[in-house]
Amino acid sequence: MLCLGEAFLQGFDSLCWNYAVDQHMAVDLQSDTIRRLRSLTARYGTALLTGYIEMDRDRIYSSCAVFESGRTVHNYRRISRGWKEYTKTDRHYCEGTVTGEFTLRGQRIMIALCGDLWDYPERFRKEHLLIWPVYVNYTPEDWNNGVLDDYAGQALTAGRDTLMVNPLDTDPVSHGGAFRFQNGPVTCRIPFDREDVLIVDTEQADR
């Protein structure tokens, strides 16, 4: 499965917090954009996990969808409110209320989006694999001087095997990075500011 970061599809700063504008940026699960993504998973035989800005009727969410073999396997909506400028937003900008696992090729997986794992770690405490798409703008110096250790520690509050994905971006600058935390420490990673794919074997995550 190819895993991408939070709000990767449109970009984390794609919203202006004016619903009349933002409703055209968000996409629903039946949109042509999502249909194309689903079709790619069937064409290439690879599942895809991506963060996106979701439209559901008249409500907008920061969501994360999983596609495999041309179908939607799972759609998770962020439960913490830090994705939005909540002093500017109205009832149209919403959070999800449900966490839960899904099964992909025999493996149980959960998703937490960025601040979810900081605000509600108790809702993600499972023994199986956790995928944690984020969007954060720390400098490499900050990451290397304690921030990465903080994220590793927070991942451990939820589970013993976590994959964290942070997208590269130029405006605002995000230095990217992908990491695997196992029982606390980082066991493999992509360096900051490098466009690359971190390949991990998660067959043991459920054992």
Labelled PLM ranges:
Residues 50-52, 62-66, 100, 176-180, ...:
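Short beta-strand scaffold segments in enzyme catalytic cores
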Residues 26-47, 118-197:
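CN hydrolase (nitrilase-like) catalytic-core segments centered on the catalytic cysteine
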Residues 194-197, 201-207:
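Acidic, His/Gly-rich catalytic cores of divalent-metal-dependent hydrolytic chemistry
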Residues 20-22, 65-69, 149, 180-181:
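Short, hinge-like loop/turn segments at secondary-structure boundaries
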Residues 52-54, 167-168:
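Beta-strand C-termini and the immediately following turn/loop, strongest in propeller blades
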Residues 56, 67-71, 181-184, 202-204:
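Short acidic-glycine loop/turn motifs at beta-strand connectors
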Residues 1-21, 48-49, 116, 126-135, ...:
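Active-site beta-strand/loop signature of hydrolases that rely on acidic residues for catalysis
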Residues 55-128, 139-147, 153:
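Active-site catalytic loop in hydrolytic enzyme cores
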